[in-house]
């Protein structure tokens, strides 16, 4: 079978497509024939060798994979064969490992998929799981007025899921994106308003979009000049949640910005999905909630960019350039 490995961290060219023997499930394991593989930011960090949860080299990236159980190990019932499942490396002892055509994992780790969820859509479920956790982190008051929510990277997979969830809670959803193509994509995937992501004009643009009221919640994964602009765009008692700093740390003192706006009583929270690394019950409950939401049609996956496994280098070039629309999905077969 084919597998992607990193022997020496670097750019997209560090991803090597290699041929290895297909795994045989050990006692208590199942083998999954991959039908779709998700591509995301943690894969880039692993490729660069700077991922905090880096496995030993040679390493195989890939945080999620969907497919069919085609073989079981000793102690696992044969009725598992043929099950449509999703595996997330968040549930495995070691991160990554999903850029493969076949994988053997402990039998209790895969999530069973309903027939209504396609394999391509299934690898967006971890994005929905993260979106659910991000809303959970906001500690929403069910009785409070919900006006607007602001999200960076509106054309991305997590942002699209977060927007859909926020609308079910009664929020107007406002996204930001760098290019007209990305803004059109985000609008087509359910955002109410999508603004240019220029941090210099963001505050004024948000105020225009909200009749001068600002937003209750702001979700930022870019950092840099963006986070201070998002904080300024909050309404009184609003909260900004930072869940990554892709463009680096803010160059201005965020606390000084908050003190400047003291009369608004604003809050800032940092969030990481790794909060749930030692809380398997909550993590799996969030994923099951994500599966149920997608299976019912309440939440839908964004249109994916589908590429073959042997195009993995090109997929990472797209990621590095920030040209992703929705979710990049690799077809391994």
Residue ranges with predicted function:
Residues 21-38, 50-91:
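Glycine-rich beta-strand-centered segment in the early N-terminal region that forms part
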Residues 78, 87-153:
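NAD(P)H dinucleotide-binding glycine-rich loop of Rossmann-like/cofactor-binding domains
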Residues 86, 216-219:
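N-terminal Rossmann-like NAD(P) cofactor-binding module of classical short-chain dehydrogenase/reductase
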Residues 98-99, 177-185, 252-257:
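Short, glycine/polar-rich helix-capping loops at beta-to-alpha or helix-loop-helix junctions
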Residues 123-200:
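Mid-domain Rossmann-like dinucleotide-binding core that forms the NAD(H)/NADP(H) cofactor-binding site
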Residues 201-212:
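Short amphipathic alpha-helix with an adjacent loop that forms part of the alpha/beta core around
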Residues 212, 291-292, 296-306, 313-333:
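C-terminal capping/lid region of NAD(P)-dependent oxidoreductase domains
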Residues 225-298, 332-333:
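Glycine-rich phosphate-binding loop and adjacent beta-alpha segment
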């Amino acid at each position: 079978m084919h597998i992607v490995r990193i022997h020496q961290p670097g750019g997209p060219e560090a991803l090597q497509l290699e041929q290895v023997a297909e795994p045989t499930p050990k006692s208590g394991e199942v083998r999954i024939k991959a039908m779709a593989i998700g591509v995301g930011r943690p894969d880039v960090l692993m490729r660069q060798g700077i991922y905090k949860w880096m496995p030993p080299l040679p390493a195989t990236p890939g945080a999620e994979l969907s497919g069919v159980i085609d073989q079981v190990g000793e102690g696992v019932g044969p009725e598992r064969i043929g099950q449509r499942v999703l595996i997330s490396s968040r549930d495995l002892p070691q991160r990554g490992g999903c850029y493969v055509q076949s994988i053997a994992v402990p039998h209790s780790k895969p999530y069973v998929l309903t027939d209504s969820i396609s394999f391509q859509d299934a690898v967006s479920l971890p994005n929905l799981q993260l979106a659910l956790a991000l809303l959970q982190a906001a500690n929403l008051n069910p009785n409070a007025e919900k006006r607007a929510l602001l999200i960076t990277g509106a054309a991305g997979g997590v942002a699209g899921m977060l927007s859909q969830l926020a609308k079910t809670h009664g929020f107007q959803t406002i996204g930001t994106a760098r290019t007209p193509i990305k803004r059109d994509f985000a609008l087509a995937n359910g955002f109410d308003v999508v603004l240019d992501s220029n941090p210099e004009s963001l505050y004024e643009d948000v105020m225009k979009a909200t009749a001068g009221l600002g937003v209750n919640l702001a979700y930022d994964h870019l950092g840099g000049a963006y986070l201070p602009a998002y904080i300024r765009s909050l309404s009184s008692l609003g909260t900004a949640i930072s869940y990554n700093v892709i463009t680096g740390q803010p160059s201005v003192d965020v606390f000084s910005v908050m003190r400047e706006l003291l009369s608004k009583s604003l809050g800032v929270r940092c969030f990481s999905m790794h909060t749930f690394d030692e809380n398997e019950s909550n993590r799996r409950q969030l994923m099951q909630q994500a599966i149920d939401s997608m299976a019912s049609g309440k939440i839908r996956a964004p249109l994916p960019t589908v590429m073959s496994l042997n195009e993995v280098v090109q997929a990472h070039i797209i990621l590095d350039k920030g040209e992703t629309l929705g979710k990049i999905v690799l077809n391994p077969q």
